[in-house]
């Protein structure tokens, strides 16, 4: 079993969710010392990848009872009770190959989901989805994770790459909820597709982005300038920032 995604509760730092491959969801209420496996109807097999895996986990920043999970390749799951029960959500979501999810707390509150070639949005808690048509904007069309800036719901970041096995990647930013996009200038050429994001709840301008093969980039001004951390890791599946 591999851990592919983690998410920290916005108000209860000891509550952590984890998603794995093969696909399963776990929850800890004591900072990760003990874990319980959650009851979720997830696929055991799927096309294109050997085992389905949880590639997205989000806790709603304003209604903490709503938790989202995205599965590659098994669509979106939603919990309305903090992870106790789950429902598969699919209306209008044409691709079940989920790579990332994010929540924009603006008016209206918007849930965003990234798939290999598209970013979808929902303003009705996942009952229906609309595509943004990002393929016409991105120079590297393969999409992985997605992040919404905590204090600016119109600002969206997407981690992209050439292909699932590409040799490099980049970061895209939109300041108008996905209508237009710009490519971020990074201090080095990433060694694989860019893969995942993490952000600081207390300082929304501080954002981390990683490549699949262990490079981590940081910005302290909301994406205008990026630095590469000197330390590198092996494969990175996901990141999360906790206040303690």
Describe the residue ranges of each PLM region.
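Extracellular glycan-interacting surfaces
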Residues: 1-244
């Amino acid at each position: 079993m591999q851990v592919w995604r983690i998410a920290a509760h916005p108000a209860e730092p000891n509550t952590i969710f984890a998603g794995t491959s093969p696909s399963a969801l776990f929850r800890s209420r004591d900072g990760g010392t003990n874990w319980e496996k959650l009851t979720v109807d997830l696929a055991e097999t799927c096309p294109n990848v050997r085992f389905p895996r949880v590639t997205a986990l989000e806790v709603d920043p304003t209604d903490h009872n709503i938790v989202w999970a995205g599965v590659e390749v098994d669509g979106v799951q939603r919990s309305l009770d903090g992870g106790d029960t789950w429902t598969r959500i699919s209306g209008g979501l044409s691709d079940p190959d989920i790579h990332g999810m994010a929540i924009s707390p603006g008016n209206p509150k918007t849930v965003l989901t990234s798939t290999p070639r598209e970013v979808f949005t929902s303003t009705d808690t996942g009952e229906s989805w609309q595509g943004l048509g990002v393929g016409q904007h991105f120079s590297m069309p393969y999409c992985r994770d997605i992040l919404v800036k905590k204090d600016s719901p119109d600002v969206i970041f997407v981690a992209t790459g050439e292909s699932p096995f590409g040799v490099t990647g980049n970061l895209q930013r939109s300041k108008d909820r996905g209508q237009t996009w710009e490519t971020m200038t990074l201090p080095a050429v990433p060694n694989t597709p860019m893969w995942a994001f993490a952000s600081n709840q207390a300082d929304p301008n501080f954002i981390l982005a990683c490549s699949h093969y262990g490079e981590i980039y940081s910005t302290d001004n909301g994406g205008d300038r990026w630095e590469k951390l000197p330390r590198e890791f092996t494969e990175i599946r996901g990141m999360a920032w906790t206040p303690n």
